[in-house]
C-alpha cells in the first residue's frame, strides 16, 4: 500500500508515531437466495524491515458484513451494498533498531461473500513522526 524509510542512527531512545489512512470502497451484491450476504474481510499489517529481517509490528482487521433473510425461507431476496469509508490506524514504535529501517503497510484479503462490481483500497498514505534525543559532541 505505502512505505517509507526511517533513519534513527543519530537518535537516542527514538520513538516513532505512525499513521496510516486510506479509503475503502466496494460495491457488492448477492441475490436469488432467501439469505443474501455481502462480506469484506481485510487484514492490514504494518511491517518493519531492518537489516533484511522482516517483522509484523501490528495488524488491524477491517470487517464489514451485511445480510438479510426470509425466516420462512420462501422468497428469494436481493442485497446490494455500496460503501466508501475511511480506514485509519495509529501505531507507536519504540523498539527500534539503530540505523535505517523500512516500514510498510500491506493489505491481505481474508474472506469475501457475494459478487463484487469493485473492491479497492485507495489513497493509501503512511506517515511518521519521529522524536528522540540527539547527542551533542561539540
Model-derived regions: residue spans:
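Extracellular jelly-roll beta-sandwich "head" domains, especially the C-terminal globular C1q domain
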Residues: 1-138
